[in-house]
Swiss-Prot record:
This is 1-deoxy-D-xylulose-5-phosphate synthase. It catalyses: D-glyceraldehyde 3-phosphate + pyruvate + H(+) = 1-deoxy-D-xylulose 5-phosphate + CO2. It is an enzyme of class 2 (transferase). One of its GO terms (cellular component) is cytosol. GO terms for molecular function: 1-deoxy-D-xylulose-5-phosphate synthase activity; magnesium ion binding; thiamine pyrophosphate binding. Its EC number is 2.2.1.7.
Amino acid sequence: MYSLLETINSPADLRRLPRAQLKALADELRAYVIDSVSQTGGHLSSNLGTVELTVALHYVFNTPDDRLVWDVGHQTYPHKILTGRRERMGTLRQLGGLSGFPRRDESEYDTFGTAHSSTSISAALGMALAAEFKGENRNAVAVIGDGSMSAGMAFEALNNAGVHDHCKLLVVLNDNDMSISPPVGALNRHLAQLMSGRFYASARHVGKKVLQVAPPLLELARRLESHAKGMVVPAAVFESFGFNYIGPIDGHDLESLIPTLENIRHLMATGAGPQFLHVVTKKGQGYKLAEADPIAYHGPGKFDPSMGLQKSSAPAKQTFTQVFGRWLCDMAEHDPRLVGITPAMREGSGMVEFHKRFPKRYHDVGIAEQHAVTFAAGMACEGLKPVLAIYSTFLQRGYDQLIHDVALQNLPVVFALDRAGLVGADGATHAGAYDIPYLRCIPNMGIACPADENECRKLLTTAFEQDSPVAVRYPRGAGAGVEPEAGLKSLPFGKGEIRREGSGIAILAFGTLLYPALQAAEKLGATVVNMRWAKPLDTELLLKVAAGHEVLVTLEEGAIMGGAGSAVGEALQAAGVVKPLLQLGLKDEFIEHGEVAVLLALQGLDAAGIEAAVRSRFGSFKSTDPLAKVMLKSVA
């Protein structure tokens, strides 16, 4: 079934194949991707769209000596298969297995780690100029999708690259949404090869020299050339940055891709400066179900390729994302000032229904987190109530805007932080581990940490009622299964509650780890406090609990350093209270991909781990004796 693919263990093997066999290899590669993802889950549509492009790039360029940088990186399964990792695809996105994204420590062919968008051009330009500085003859290639081109960082890199006339940089725009280009055909293929050819480049260069003596003629020539290209391709914007624009061409046509890339490689060798190749691909290419619904097959779980995705017959728990989506629609019905904003994450953030029902109040700003935050600030200035739905890890990209444009002006923006805490198979790049530390230090900022689905809905309402910025952080997937109450009830701002009365030890839980804390407390005989807010901290409740207990434990699904536990320590110190304090949370390390439950256990944040950590630090005691004295083994 994979007779050709099984002979390819590196791009060097690929480059030894006759060109006539590449189409058959691409077909096998596509089938292998479908088979692999069906068994492990993962990104599918985007990978099916890059099969031929991946084959062509590795065939033409001398990787890994030539640097190949993939933007975002979820479309690199064909790249992984061709670079010696075919046999490990069964471990994809599993604990100890292959990452779903490029990793420098995984392969020398993964020249730059990616998972967040729009970084590839900057990285590839840095590599190209470093090679030039060191006197090394190598090329750098950045592959970036049309969605990623909406981020300002991509254009900052283009702007910088354009001033380096001789750098060996190629930017490949993988246009898989047809959002930029018109349909392509034979004329476009011919023009692309012509524009990347030696005669065209030479004639263009010589013509400019000749016309230097007659500036008006030079300007006329520029206009004529631009007009001729403009009839077929959107060249002007990229050439204005100093790139030689080529395309668009069919990204699934190897007979077009390979000669065009060979021509570009020659141009780079002759010092022609940065090159820009526009290819048009189709998400889900070659698998009809994914072609018909590329969004559904963007990141599927395991499935039968012959049947496609099947709806589960068992009723699923409501996810936090769904809780948010329903609250958003209900609050929009209640308050006409509400506007919803997303940076290109409509489905992932649960805003599909809101978009359908309130299209004029829905704003997808594209992959542009910095803009999204300040855009929300501008709306808040005019009396609207913006709700920005964004993954915790992506809000990091708009941090200056969060401080300067929102918090400094104390504007009432609600940040619905999805994917807070561990995210499972997507791993360290997508984990929402740092939002409490990076938000807690900002004046005027509130941070709510709901323990379950019902609290999530209520705390979203509380956040919306404030006249200051508030973030509500909640994890991926389902929680404890607490059904949200109807209506738009709120909870007191900055106030927690005692959920279990015990003695000796008090566990202060922030967020969904309340439930494993309650389980551990049954065996420890401990008090459990549902703190709800990392900021403002309920210091009144904290000091009351501290006065009645011998030791305190904080618990959060976030970084310990600077997190909610640190806030508790600071509050105790400010009040002059000295208590043994154990802070439990995510360790000072990047946490790899795997199942969330397994990762939490490895971090010691399941019920057994919490109990073990408390006993290790403070000694043993019996839950059946509420008056048992806590024996301290060590006190910081």
